[in-house]
A protein has these predicted regions:
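Active-site loop/lid in soluble adenylation, ligation, and acyl-transfer enzymes
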Residues: 2-6, 77-79, 275
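Non-heme Fe(II) oxygenase catalytic core, chiefly the N-lobe of the double-stranded beta-helix
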Residues: 9-10, 14, 18-214, 222
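Catalytic core of Fe(II)/2-oxoglutarate
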Residues: 213-282
Length: 282
């Protein structure tokens, strides 16, 4: 039987119908609130996925694991750690593109973003060098509206034609140091996510300048969580963000969590997450 561990995760707090749709506003104009929701911690159980690592499927569970030694070559990892975006795009993006095509059968992959994270216990948001902290709130990066908006944002001339086929967003997450002992990444089995748990959250700037739409997640006791114990740098996690096709694994809520058995001297987690638009003729 796979090992299971207790964890705390932050979910969207219970809401009433009169509260309206959730939103977050950056650089809020005077007199405008930053958000109309808050998060609450819940206790969850996280199961070690390693005994069944190769059984998870993107189109069923919303996530999958894969072994990718090419992307974990020392020179590649060092370039990512150094934060040189041009070098990362030149060295690492082609490897991710090939990986995604091999695992999804996609005819085209467009990488639009990547984030490097290094946990620093004394910081809540970003390190001084701009690297983000692990995300401790349960979320999914894009709603269906936000995802389609991304297609038009990055590929405006081709968007209408591309969206006639199957379109997806998949994030590729990789540790930059292994094994991961500190704040590992947890992913939720999409088959245990209920429609009522999903809350599209508009992202405004200023007053009502729409910048995108993400997804907040509320808690229910039937949700199942997994993580890959002692994940190594050659092991990647693919996270489904959105899928235009009606499949069981249409999205994957995810969150970093504090493992109860993390050694006191564990190296602080470092990771890279690459965000991919994926297109196929289906």
């Amino acid at each position: 039987m796979a090992a299971q561990y207790p964890a705390q995760m932050n979910f969207l707090a219970p809401r009433k119908p009169e509260d309206g749709p959730t939103f977050y506003r950056s650089a809020a104009a005077e007199g405008f609130e930053t958000s109309n929701f808050h998060q609450e911690p819940y206790s969850v159980t996280v199961t070690d996925a390693r005994p069944q690592r190769d059984s998870f499927q993107l189109d069923t569970h919303g996530f999958a694991f894969a072994v990718d030694p090419e992307g974990s070559q020392p020179e590649v990892l060092e370039a990512i750690r150094a934060g040189d975006k041009e070098t990362v795009q030149k060295l690492y993006y082609p490897l991710v593109e090939k990986l995604i095509k091999d695992h999804t059968g996609a005819s085209r992959v467009f990488i639009f973003d990547h984030t490097v994270r290094r946990r620093e216990a004394s910081l809540a948001g970003k390190n001084p060098n701009g690297r983000e902290q692990p995300a401790g709130t349960v979320h999914c990066d894009q709603s269906p509206l936000g995802a389609r908006r991304r297609v038009y944002q990055h590929l405006p001339e081709e968007a209408d034609e591309l969206l006639k086929g199957r379109a997806r967003i998949v994030n590729v997450w990789r540790p930059l140091k292994g094994p991961v002992l500190d704040w590992p990444l947890a992913v939720m089995d999409c088959t245990t996510l209920q429609k009522a748990d999903i809350h599209p959250t508009k992202l405004y700037r200023g007053r009502f300048e729409l910048r995108g739409e993400t997804v907040s997640i509320s808690h229910n006791a039937g949700q199942h969580w997994y993580y890959l114990d002692r994940q190594q740098t050659d092991e990647i996690t693919m996270i489904k963000i959105w899928d235009s096709k009606d499949v069981a694994g249409h999205m994957c809520a995810h969150c970093a969590f504090q493992h109860p058995e993390t050694p006191e001297d564990a190296p602080l987690r470092e990771s890279v997450e690459v965000r991919c638009l994926i297109f196929s003729d289906e």
